[in-house]
Amino acid sequence: MLVDFDGSISAIVDDPASARALPAARDALADLIGTFETVAVVSGRPVEFLARAIDVPGLTLVGQYGLERMEDGRAVVDARAEPYLGAVAAAADELEGELPDLLVERKAGVAVTVHWRTSPDRGSAAIEVVDRVASRHGLTAYATKMARELRPPVPADKGTAVELLVDGSSGACFAGDDRGDLDAFAALARLAAAGRLEHAVRIAVGSAEAPAELLAQADVAVDGPPGLVSLLKELAGAATRTPR
């Protein structure tokens, strides 16, 4: 069982640092651990943030779109990203200087995100600046909800993370709400088509900001984080009732 964080088990908030998993989501994930072979959160957030914001022992954490993972309580960065960490830091400095009125989020040195949720009229200008800075530093720009992120140009995304997590499993579910989750959906579809997964379920966590493609590709749609929490609780309850 694999889930996204923001907008899936946590509400979308103006200040990214204040986001926390819904208490009912914590309980449901804790109940699922031991029932599923793997219960994981696959997110664009740093794993140390996820550990604090979710606080569920035994949960597998993959962050930074697959560039970071938690191992034995320690954040481990993909070695392929390390040569670009200096460029990420320099880009963050420039973005803070050029966009002083917007939130520039430094993500444990691995990525940097510019947010305009509280200033929606600044979106176009922010995108122009972010893309220019990305080009100057050899980084890649990605669109997210009311934000744009710079990452190392490394072939890693939620899809590659999901492929590693489900390797050898007979089935997998992934739940997400944003454009970056489409890569996870595509990975499950590829694995199922290749016969590497017997069952693959893609769950769209709907909202007014959810991409149309996400809803179109989903096998199941739920209404926001509360809807996903209800589904997770149903799965946990069904597993408890099923004889072993």
Which sequence ranges carry the predicted segments?
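Asp-based phosphoryl-transfer active-site loop
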Residues: 1-15, 41
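Conserved Rossmann-like nucleotide-cofactor binding loop
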Residues: 8, 47, 180
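Short, flexible loop segments at the rims of nucleotide/cofactor-binding pockets, characterized by
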Residues: 16-20, 39-40, 149-154
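Active-site phosphate-binding/coordination module
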Residues: 20-107
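Mg2+-dependent phosphoryl-transfer enzymes with acidic/Ser/Thr/Gly-rich catalytic loops
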Residues: 22, 159-244
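Proline-centered loop/turn at the N-terminus of a beta-strand
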Residues: 38-40, 60, 140, 171, ...
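Short, structured coil segments at secondary-structure junctions
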Residues: 54-57, 137, 198, 216-218
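Conserved acidic, metal-coordinating active-site core of Asp-based
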Residues: 101-198
